[in-house]
UniProtKB/Swiss-Prot annotation:
Part of the ribosomal stalk of the 50S ribosomal subunit. The N-terminus interacts with L11 and the large rRNA to form the base of the stalk. The C-terminus forms an elongated spine to which L12 dimers bind in a sequential fashion forming a multimeric L10(L12)X complex. It comes from the Bacteria. NCBIfam families: PRK00099.1-1. Pfam families: Ribosomal_L10. This is Large ribosomal subunit protein uL10. InterPro entries: Ribosomal_uL10, Ribosomal_uL10-like_sf, Ribosomal_uL10_bac, Ribosomal_uL10_bac_type. It comes from Psychrobacter cryohalolentis (strain ATCC BAA-1226 / DSM 17306 / VKM B-2378 / K5). HAMAP family: Ribosomal_uL10. SUPFAM superfamilies: Ribosomal protein L10-like (SSF160369). GO terms for biological process: translation. Forms part of the ribosomal stalk, playing a central role in the interaction of the ribosome with GTP-bound translation factors. The gene is rplJ. Keywords: Ribonucleoprotein, Ribosomal protein, RNA-binding, rRNA-binding. GO terms for molecular function: large ribosomal subunit rRNA binding.
Length: 175
């Protein structure tokens, strides 16, 4: 069933809004995956803060105009499933990568992060990017390390002094 002009405009507006707020996007060819498996993929995506859209490429190209995913437009061919990361950079890549391990029919075509389009070979690398919480904890650990080392160094001096005095005392008692 063909979409009316109003329906097409609504689809373009929805995808454009999602793309404007997304951190990254993954385009994957889904040909050969059944409805039940796609439904399972959608459930997994929702849990991870990923929005999945199946849209005609011409409508997706219009929706991407003026967004950081505009560079994907000229490389979109075939029936594509678009996954948008709404919470962190790697969430869409993580969902698609994990799902494609078990379902070889889901074939990644494009990965876009920060306006740069990568090929399917970069999907695993993007999927391993830390989540926002993980990145914050890594940053905090890095910032905390010099202070921790300083405290350990400052505690080492009195500790060495006490051990030296104890060794002298033990040596005098033994003599």
């Amino acid at each position: 069933m063909a979409l009316t002009l109003e329906q097409k405009q609504q689809v373009v507006a929805e995808v454009s809004e999602v793309a404007a707020n997304a951190y990254s996007a993954v385009a994957a060819e889904y040909h050969g995956i059944g409805v039940a498996k796609l439904t399972k993929l959608r459930e997994q995506a929702r849990e991870k803060g990923v929005v999945l859209k199946v849209v005609k490429n011409t409508l997706a190209k219009r929706a991407f105009e003026g967004t950081k995913f505009e560079s994907m437009s000229d490389r979109m061919t075939g029936p594509l499933l678009l996954a948008f990361s709404m919470e962190d950079l790697g969430s869409a890549a993580r969902v698609i990568f994990d799902f494609s391990k078990d379902h070889k029919a889901l074939e990644t075509k494009l990965v876009s992060v920060g306006g740069v389009v990568y090929g399917p070979e970069e999907l695993e690398r993007v999927s391993k990017l830390p989540t926002r919480d993980e990145a914050i904890s890594i940053l905090m650990a890095t910032m905390n390390a010099p202070v921790t080392k300083l405290v350990q160094t400052m505690n080492a001096v009195p500790g060495k002094f006490v051990r030296t005095v104890a060794a002298i005392k033990d040596a005098k008692e033994a003599a």
